[in-house]
């Protein structure tokens, strides 16, 4: 679960647009935040992970509030807010990521399932890695395919169409889910987006083209958008119309425009009279988000969750499962525990209210795993557990 955003504009609004969009998308990941943008022909990247004493988004905002706006010539950029799956919550593991030759910069929402074999293959071709993430592998894979196209055509003078071919070859190698927004250091007037499973929304307005993983990321600045289909590639660049530079886009497929609902997403219950009713009405959408709009559902109808693969041996060694929850989360956990009993081969599956759980409730023999289900983000009794 991550939020991502991108923009190409004919006005100097990139950084403000990215920061405002990430503010609206912060519910998609509190662990880290970052942006990358072209300042003239140079890519500038700034990213932070949250700590126990500092919020990554506030730190990023403060850095750019302290800078003189005249110092930046920002028309194109990408941004990301992270929920850590592959790799620890650190600055270096935060997005955007770049290839080891600094050719490609990307942000990514999703999980690359075959990252281990891809990483080993790229290392054998001389690529290096700074992070523990699956996303850095995609950046290096883009560079690899771009370089191979240069070798095959025996030229260093490659066009932005070669970038698109490199993207096509890259996604053929990937297994999993992804929403990708891509910058190339050779082309400061171009942005690319592609997806498989993870959603990407794209909007073309009078002065800019914007990309977001969900509607709230547009933060009220667009009138309409379309939802990119799986494995289509959106190429975004400038077109000259009557000697005026206009941001434009191209896709292989034809899309129907969707009007944006006019509401203040994060700061008000509008159009509902109060927050409770808004949350009730948004439950179907919340269920879809929990599934990452299908991005966590694999083609064989199994579910892919981030972080499980690294602990799979420990999970398989468990004999007992205990759900701990409070309030409505406790009711949900009661249902989940009954499903676990039916589908899973654990010796025992139990569910406790967090306020009533005691240390003596833990089975005395064999390994026990705990599933803590919070309510509205924070539950004191679960902290106690």
Q: Each PLM stretch: what is its role?
A:
Residues 1-269, 273-276, 285-317:
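Conserved short alpha-helical segments that host acidic/polar catalytic motifs at enzyme active sites
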Residues 317-385:
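Glycine-rich phosphate-binding loops that contact phosphosugars or nucleotide phosphates
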């Amino acid at each position: 679960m991550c939020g991502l955003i991108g923009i190409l504009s004919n006005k100097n609004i990139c950084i403000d647009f990215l920061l405002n969009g990430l503010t609206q998308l912060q519910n998609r990941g509190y662990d880290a935040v970052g942006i990358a943008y072209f300042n003239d022909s140079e890519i500038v990247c700034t990213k932070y992970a949250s700590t126990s004493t500092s919020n990554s988004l506030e730190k990023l905002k403060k850095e750019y509030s302290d800078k003189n706006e005249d110092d930046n010539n920002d028309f194109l950029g990408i941004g990301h807010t992270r929920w850590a799956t592959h790799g620890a919550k650190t600055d270096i593991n935060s997005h955007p990521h770049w290839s080891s030759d600094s050719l490609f910069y990307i942000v990514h929402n999703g999980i690359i399932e075959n990252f281990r074999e891809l990483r080993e293959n790229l290392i054998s071709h001389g690529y290096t890695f700074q992070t523990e993430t699956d996303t850095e592998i995609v950046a290096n894979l883009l560079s690899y395919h771009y370089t191979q196209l240069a070798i095959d055509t025996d030229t260093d003078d490659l066009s932005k169409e070669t970038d698109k071919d490199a993207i096509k070859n890259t996604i053929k190698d990937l297994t999993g889910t992804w929403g990708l927004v891509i910058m190339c250091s050779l082309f400061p007037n171009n942005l690319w987006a592609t997806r498989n499973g993870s959603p990407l929304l794209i909007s073309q307005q009078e002065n800019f083209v914007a990309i977001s993983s969900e509607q709230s990321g547009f933060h009220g600045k667009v009138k309409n958008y379309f939802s990119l289909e799986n494995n289509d590639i959106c190429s975004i660049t400038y077109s000259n119309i009557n000697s005026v530079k206009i941001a434009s886009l191209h896709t292989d497929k034809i899309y129907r425009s969707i009007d944006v609902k006019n509401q203040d997403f994060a700061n008000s219950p509008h159009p509902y009279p109060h927050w409770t009713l808004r949350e009730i009405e948004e439950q179907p959408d919340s269920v879809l988000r929990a599934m990452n709009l299908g991005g966590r559902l694999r083609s064989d109808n199994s579910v892919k969750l981030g972080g499980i693969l690294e602990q799979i041996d420990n999970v398989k060694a468990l004999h007992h499962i205990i759900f701990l929850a409070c309030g409505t989360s406790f009711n949900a956990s009661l249902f989940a525990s009954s499903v676990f009993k039916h589908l899973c081969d654990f010796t025992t599956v139990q569910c406790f209210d967090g306020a009533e759980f005691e240390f003596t409730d833990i089975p005395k023999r064999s390994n026990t795993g705990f599933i803590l289900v919070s309510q509205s983000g924070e539950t004191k009794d679960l902290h106690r557990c």
